[in-house]
Amino acid sequence: MEKYLSVTTLTKYLKMKFDKDPYLERVYLTGQVSNFRKRPTHQYFSLKDDHAVIQATIWSGIYQKLGFDLEEGMKINVIGRVQVYEPSGSYSIIIEKAEPDGVGALAIQFEQLKKKLTEEGLFQERFKQALPQFSKRIGVVTSRSGAVIRDIITTVSRRFPGVDILLYPTKVQGEGAAEEIARNIARANQRDDLDLLIIGRGGGSIEDLWAFNEEIVVRAIFESRLPVISSVGHETDVTLADFVADRRAATPTAAAELATPVTKLDVLTHLQNQEKRMATAVRNVLSKKQEALKKCSQSVIFRQPERLYDGYLQRLDQLQLRLKQSLRTRISDNKQLVQARTHQLVQLSPVTKIQRYQDRLGQLDKLLDSQMALVYDAKVAEAKRLSEALLMLDTSRIVARGYAIVKKEESVVDSVESLKKKDQVTLLMRDGQVELEVKDVKTKEI
């Protein structure tokens, strides 16, 4: 009886076959990129030819080291291993290395990196540094044994003897060359006594010059504090190092000439010309001063020097007169001020105040005596008048003169209106009193 396998069992069997097949552990494959969409980490796409398609995967760490970007339709050569993905029962190639297919592979990498760095702005003119006019020490990053360093030393020594050349022996092609170039550029920038840096090598194929197209080298040049001259290959060779460097030289000799724009002969010639111009300028100044001295010696002041002081003497007399007037005015003002202050002090003196108060007290004492006398006289007169009035009111005196006083209930009757018939009244007379009864009341017609 036939035994049926499950899908899982079959898939696991196929995976085991794939994993144990030595041929599938390292496959060399060429194909065209299809269904590619760049992702931030791992890349998943297809490789195809005219008759078949296989899924492909590149892990992010591998992809970052490729040196170029995948593009839709690009033909590439890859090395990888084939594996089965059990959940879907599909197989794919896990790519470990990849490069563009054909002669233009490096050109593609060059253009892609150039585009990337251009977009970042590394090649912009605003980042270029000016080369120094005079350099005391120049650093050179190149091979120890190449013709480059010999040409640079010869040219610099000829143009400006005394300039120091500091060589950083560097591997300029092959594996590890780019890292060593970048490392020596960084080392040179750590020194404070370098004025300029030249990097370069002689001519060669694009593969020979490729280290100077690596991103690590380009960024090292961009980050250099020192101005950098690039001299890589022949005049027709162009590298990314040339784009990012502050200046590009077609040959090592040209690089040395750029590094020493002013030669020793130029300096000597300039100094000689300056010496001549200074001598001419001194002669001209001396001639002008002599002419001025001659004119001065012929002037009236030198012939009659006493006239030089006429104006000053007149001015001095005027100032002396003004000074005397000013002093007299100030003395007079100060005298008046002293007198005024003296008068104020006298007025404010305690003795003066006491004297004023004593005078005022005497005046008030006299005024008080006068007022008291007046008040006394007035009071005496008033008392006399009141005494006379009291005497006039004394009943004994009234009746003594022959008058009689009528009283009703101990009250003096001064009007008939206060009486009525049958009222009992008392009539006071000089020698006694009479008790009477009112019989009739008659009002006097007025």
Curated annotation (Swiss-Prot):
Any one GO molecular function term: nucleic acid binding
Cytoplasm as UniProt keyword: yes
GO cellular component labels: cytoplasm; exodeoxyribonuclease VII complex
CDD domains: ExoVII_LU_OBF
Keywords for this protein: Cytoplasm, Exonuclease, Hydrolase, Nuclease
Subcellular location per the Swiss-Prot or TrEMBL entry: Cytoplasm
Catalytic activity: Exonucleolytic cleavage in either 5'- to 3'- or 3'- to 5'-direction to yield nucleoside 5'-phosphates
Disulphide linkage map: none
The enzyme's E.C. designation: 3.1.11.6
GO terms classed as biological process: DNA catabolic process
Stored InterPro entries: Exonuc_VII_L (IPR003753), Exonuc_VII_lsu_C (IPR020579), OB-fold_nuc-bd_dom (IPR025824)
Similarity field: Belongs to the XseA family.
Assembly mode: Heterooligomer composed of large and small subunits.
Described purpose of this protein according to its UniProt entry: Bidirectionally degrades single-stranded DNA into large acid-insoluble oligonucleotides, which are then degraded further into small acid-soluble oligonucleotides.
The name this protein goes by in its record: Exodeoxyribonuclease 7 large subunit
Source taxonomy: Bacteria, Bacillati, Bacillota, Bacilli, Lactobacillales
